[in-house]
């Protein structure tokens, strides 16, 4: 069962570096509820894929941005973004859960 957790900044040890890349859909910068999943990734990528209800399944519509842009425009997501590889979250209700299949995927 997904649970609600809140990470304090001190506990968010897996926060991406500001120069790492994040994949986002339309609606992320606009403040929509976000579904996030963090995949094991190469060093230049944070592993985070952030989508909203505006995402239509077309990967060509996704954008790659630096983490510092997300931290600036969506500070409400910062605690979630400190979760380790394999985690998922839904910002709309604060649920977080671990997905072993995601954690085991190849970078």
Locate the predicted segments by residue.
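Short, conserved acidic/polar surface loops in the N-terminal third of protein domains
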Residues: 62
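A short local loop/turn or secondary-structure capping micro-motif enriched for an aromatic residue
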Residues: 58-59, 107
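Short, compact, well-ordered microdomains
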Residues: 66-106
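Short helix/strand-capping turn motifs
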Residues: 5-57, 65-67
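Fe(II)/2-oxoglutarate
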Residues: 1-3
